[in-house]
Amino acid sequence: MKTLLVFTFALMAFFRASAQVDMELSLDQDYFLPSETIPLAVKITNRSGQQLHLGADADWLTFNVEADDGFVVIKNAEVPVTGAFDLETSQLAIKRVDLQPYFAMTKPGRYHVIATLHIKDWSAQMASQPKHFDVIAGAKLWSQDFGVKDGTNAAPEVRKYTLEQANYLKQQLRLYVQVSDAAEDTVYKVTALGPMVSFSHTEAQVDRSSRLNVLWQAGAQSFNYAIVNPDGTVALTDYYDNFYSRPRLTVNENGDVVVLGGTRRPKPTELPIVKPPNQLPPLTKPVMPTVTDTNK
């Protein structure tokens, strides 16, 4: 009887929390490569009519990932969501996390994530609706080992750049770069570089700073260029058009990898600022030169 009462009170607390607090999960995309960053947004709306105190405990917001086919997903650690805050009634709070480092989702397939919100003041918890996503396999296009110096005279660490393409939404090809150890046993980062066409002749060169320079075709006459750091972050992205000549990678006389040919598109920050009419200087009447009558 006592167990039944405890279960009943817990169930009542769950329904109370669910009715007065909304929680929604969202992803920027639904398809990811193994080891790619999976940025999840958790939207919490307070409809209880009173202030909520959230985030004070380490386990106030927890996550669970499962494979739809029953494959066991190993949880490496709890996803950290830090920072206490007060959520007033009718207010919305958004917390953003990356699921990738904390769950082993290396097998291609369909997965879903569920978030659980623990409300300490109510001794209650509520679970979100599952958010589904897919982990897809990429096709390897190119790979190369490179060395990373650690600032000492020791032998450099050997890592590997790998370019992969994946059919995003089965409609659009996307180009990815993976940074791993030489054996590809440890993947440090997978980054999406952007869309590409099926007939793209992708060029890749590692420069003297161990950065990867990539040039690929993204449209009928458009090309994208990216520089990737040894840690997998993108240092620079430029866009070129096939006007008069096709862009290609080359090494100049200084030993730097550069883009030769094509027409580079200026970035918005490089364009001159056009002021609105109300900020333009006022028009002034032109000063006419004085004419002296020499016949007088």
PLM regions and their residue ranges:
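Repeated scaffold domains used in trafficking and secretory/extracellular systems
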Residues: 143-151, 195-205, 239-254, 285-291
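Low-complexity, Pro/Ser/Thr- and charge-rich linker/hinge segments at domain boundaries
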Residues: 130-158, 238
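N-terminal signal peptide c-region/cleavage motif recognized by signal peptidases
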Residues: 14-16
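Terminal connector regions
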Residues: 102-137
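Contiguous segments within soluble domain cores/interaction surfaces
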Residues: 20-25, 31-33, 37-100, 110-116, ...
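Surface-exposed loop/turn elements that mediate protein-protein interactions on large endomembrane-trafficking
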Residues: 174-195, 222-241, 267-293
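Positively charged n-region of N-terminal signal peptides that target proteins for export
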Residues: 1-4
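Short beta-strand elements that form the blades of beta-propeller/WD-repeat-like
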Residues: 150-179, 203-219, 225, 247-272
